């Protein structure tokens, strides 16, 4: 998008919405290289407030959750840098909206509308999420990598903004070359690399069902689909041990634990749990009285009274 100017894209949006008000417009809010346009004219993420009809991919959430896409072994919130990314995670869970109670500069918070933030950790380019986690967690077990994958997905689906996943992400899609290396940008790779391995639907059914459950949770609880900054700023965040984060929506509590050890959370309330590290959905899993244990690299989503 950044190779085009703001005025041109705003004109395009107006004409498209005149034809069909339901058209959704989104793109990559960067230039992808050099650009002759002055920065203030570029249709890019830093100028998103001047492009109110366009959503843009949140590389803040992407790299904050899993580490930089430009360095295979770099880690993010779910795979090794929990404490130092906790404030960023609270910010992206707020849809990138600036908040006084979150330690992130207002200049880095690029939108006032959660609808503009496309939240993702995997797309067509760069390593798949599963391959990125395997590259950055070389000592981790298979179960630990899957837990990190599911935690990353939970952040995508339960953050304010627009969730986005890549085809096959829900079955731990990998793009593996014949030599065993992971392919970053597979636009010129053969079908053996790019094809979805449908046997993984069976092999990874537990992960797929977790993604399905997260989608159901997002649809069921309007607290994850807020439409304005004023509402989002009412979410109460608490930073916990090891960079864990609790988000209190008033009657609904989300706890995110990125650490490699369990976390005990006490609020003295009766909690009806809808999601943990194994299952997510709209039917209660169990009731906790006063306290709940959050598994390593897991979540707890609970209504409380």
Regions found by a protein language model. Name each.
Residues 9-12, 39-42, 180-182, 268-269:
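Short, glycine/charged-enriched secondary-structure capping and boundary segments
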Residues 22-172, 178, 189, 258-259:
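Conserved alpha/beta catalytic core and glycan-binding cleft of carbohydrate-active enzymes
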Residues 8, 54, 58, 227-231:
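General structural signal for secondary-structure boundaries
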Residues 1-36:
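Active-site neighborhood of glycoside hydrolase catalytic domains
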């Amino acid at each position: 998008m950044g190779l085009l100017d703001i005025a041109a894209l705003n004109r395009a949006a107006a004409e498209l919405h005149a034809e069909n008000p339901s058209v959704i417009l989104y793109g990559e809010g960067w230039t992808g290289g050099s650009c002759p346009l002055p920065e203030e004219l570029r249709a890019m993420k830093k100028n998103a407030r001047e492009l109110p009809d366009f959503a843009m991919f949140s590389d803040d959430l992407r790299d904050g959750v899993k580490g930089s896409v430009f360095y295979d072994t770099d880690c993010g919130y779910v795979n090794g840098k929990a404490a130092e990314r906790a404030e960023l995670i609270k910010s992206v869970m707020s849809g990138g909206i600036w908040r006084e109670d979150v330690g992130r500069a207002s200049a880095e918070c690029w939108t006032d509308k959660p609808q503009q933030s496309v939240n993702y950790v995997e797309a067509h380019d760069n390593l798949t999420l599963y391959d990125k986690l395997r590259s950055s967690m070389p000592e981790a077990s298979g179960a630990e990598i899957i837990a990190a994958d599911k935690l990353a997905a939970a952040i995508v689906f339960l953050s304010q903004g627009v969730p986005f996943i890549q085809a096959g992400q829900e079955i731990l899609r990998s793009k593996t070359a014949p030599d065993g290396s992971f392919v970053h940008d597979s636009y010129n790779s053969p079908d053996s690399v790019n094809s979805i391995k449908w046997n993984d639907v069976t092999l990874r059914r537990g992960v797929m069902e977790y993604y399905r459950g997260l989608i159901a949770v997002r649809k069921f609880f309007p607290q994850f689909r807020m439409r304005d900054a004023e509402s989002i700023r009412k979410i109460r965040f608490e930073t916990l041990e090891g960079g864990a984060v609790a988000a209190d929506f008033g009657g609904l509590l989300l706890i995110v634990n990125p650490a490699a050890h369990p976390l005990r959370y006490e609020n003295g309330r009766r909690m009806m749990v809808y999601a943990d590290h194994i299952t997510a959905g709209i039917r209660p899993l169990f009731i906790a009285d006063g306290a709940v244990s959050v598994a390593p690299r897991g979540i707890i989503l609970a209504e409380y009274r």
